[in-house]
Design a protein with these regions (language model features):
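Charge-rich, N-proximal long alpha-helical rod segments
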Residues: 1-21, 25
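Elongated, mostly alpha-helical coiled-coil "stalk/stator" tethers of large membrane protein machines
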Residues: 27, 33-153
Length: 153
């Protein structure tokens, strides 16, 4: 009789262990699915934002923004030797950017800038000022990841 009792207890313990293991596996799988869904939502949101920024970069307001960025950068990078990097699509605005900068500078195309804006580098001052829409979008993505309340527990 005692052997039967221990056998039943062992079987029950094994069943509980198996059930707990299955629940844990299912919970892990559902969390993984939820994480993938969250990533998909986030990627969609930021792809749409990128598309809107690319459309904005075709407007007159964008040219005004480039001028503002160039003017702001010139107040920070006061020594000579500044290089302003822009995206390929903005090559037509080089003269406008130079004029807004107000000092002698080089303006070069950078393949790393996909959306737009200005990346200013002054090696003499050891400073970089990033006013690219690319970096601003990435900053928003980081902020969104931290503050979106799309946490997975």
């Amino acid at each position: 009789m005692r052997d039967a009792y221990y056998l039943i207890q062992n079987e029950m313990a094994q069943m509980k262990k198996n059930i707990a293991s299955e629940v844990s596996k299912l919970e892990f799988e559902k969390r993984r699915e939820l994480f993938a869904k969250r990533q998909t939502i986030m990627n969609d949101v930021f792809k749409k934002a990128q598309d809107k920024l690319l459309n904005f970069a075709k407007t007159q307001d964008y040219i005004k923004l480039l001028k503002n960025y160039a003017g702001a950068v010139s107040k920070i990078l006061k020594k000579s030797g500044t290089v302003l990097y822009i995206c390929k699509r903005d090559e037509g605005f080089i003269d406008v950017i130079r004029e807004a900068y107000g000092k002698i500078c080089k303006v070069e195309v950078s393949d790393s800038i996909k959306i737009g804006g200005i990346l200013a580098v002054n090696k003499v001052m050891s400073l970089v000022v990033d006013e690219t829409l690319d970096s601003k979008l990435e900053e928003q993505r980081n902020w969104f990841e931290e503050n979106s309340k799309l946490n997975i527990f």
